[in-house]
Amino acid sequence: MKKNFIKKAATALLLVSTLALSACGKKASEPVKIGVPDDGTNQSRAIKLLETAGLIEVDPAAGYTPELKDVTKYIYNIEIVPTTANTLTSTLGDYGASTINGTYAIPYGLVPSK
């Protein structure tokens, strides 16, 4: 059940973020900053999303709840920046990409299914 929920949550976030994340850091001279929620549950989901998108590698021992310390490799030149979840929409301009929960994305006009 938990595995399926995390997979669905990551897929929903992936739908919102794929275009922005796919080009992150490929030729950037400075790291591209990616905003992620700073609370444990949502940060784990964001890390799994970034792993699924092929931007980072995570220690398999972390399972379904990885933390930033579990990131073993950055595939691209990115920097993961923990930020209060409810401010990620209003700080979009501060980051190259953000992983935003539907709870905050939808009221801001971001549609996860598009």
Model-derived regions, located:
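Active-site-proximal beta-strand/loop segments in catalytic clefts of secreted hydrolases
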Residues: 36-39, 83, 102-103
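C-terminal motif of bacterial Sec signal peptides marking the signal peptidase cleavage site
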Residues: 19-23
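Alpha-to-beta junction loops
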Residues: 32, 55, 76-79, 93-100
